Regions:
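RNA-binding accessory domains that recognize and position tRNA/RNA substrates
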Residues: 1-46, 50-51, 65, 173-178, ...
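Active-site-proximal beta-strand elements of phosphoester/diester hydrolases
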Residues: 13-18, 126-127, 166-170
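Catalytic beta-strand/loop cores that center a nucleophilic Ser/Cys/Thr
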Residues: 122-162
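Beta-strand-turn-beta hairpins that frame and shape the catalytic cleft
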Residues: 9-14, 120-123, 160-165
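Structured helix-beta-strand junction loops
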Residues: 32, 51, 80-81, 141-142, ...
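Cysteine-nucleophile active-site neighborhood
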Residues: 55, 59-125, 133, 175-188, ...
Length: 194
């Protein structure tokens, strides 16, 4: 988006930094009656804080995450001040904001059949479309791996309980496969905000 906008709801107030957000992610927030405040990629921490959000969500989007300098700065400024959730490129932005690094993958993850392993051993078939990844070993102390890719071992999700940051590399609004199913990322997010 080029200008901030709001999608009203009576639930938790969620600030969203739009890096190219997919409609199903907005629908996932709306399905939980969130009061959604969407901001463009170049928003500042002060602008986000002005809407008094319960949490910040960094969306998916195309391209090299190091180019999202304003979003990286915003996340860096807000880390530890409110819960932050990231998906897809949003995870990469959060990783960079914490001082981690990203790299261009030899073979990007594209399609609705990418298997990821949860830290407890469970497997999800996910939908993904990215050519960059966060280097797991570049993340600072306090970060823990939540998901890894079954095929290549790349990082698919991380969290930092001290800064209240949770991120996934896949599209959490849809599970891969022949029918629409949502991965419990947003349910977990709203349960933690309650």
């Amino acid at each position: 988006c080029r200008h901030p906008y709001r999608i009203g709801g009576s639930g938790k107030r969620i600030a969203v930094i739009d890096l190219g957000i997919r409609e199903n992610m907005i629908l996932s927030l709306r399905n939980r009656n969130a009061d959604i405040h969407v901001f463009p990629h170049d928003t500042t921490a002060d602008q986000v804080e002005a809407c008094s959000p319960d949490a910040l969500f960094i969306s998916n989007g195309p391209g090299d995450p190091v180019q999202a300098k304003d979003a990286i700065r915003c996340v860096s400024d807000l880390a530890g001040n409110l819960p932050i959730y990231g998906a897809c490129m949003g995870m990469q932005v959060c990783g960079l904001a914490l001082g981690g690094s990203t790299y261009k993958m030899k073979f990007g993850h594209r399609g609705s059949n990418q298997p990821v392993r949860e830290k407890d051993g469970g497997i999800y078939i996910t939908s993904q479309n990215h050519g960059f990844a966060v280097a797991a070993d570049s993340l600072p102390d306090g970060c823990r791996v939540l998901f890894t890719n079954v095929n290549d071992g790349s990082l698919e999700g991380f969290g930092n309980q001290y800064l209240d940051i949770t991120c996934v590399q896949f599209h959490p609004g849809a599970r891969g496969g022949s029918r629409y199913e949502e991965i419990p990322f947003f349910d977990t997010m709203f349960r933690r905000l309650s």
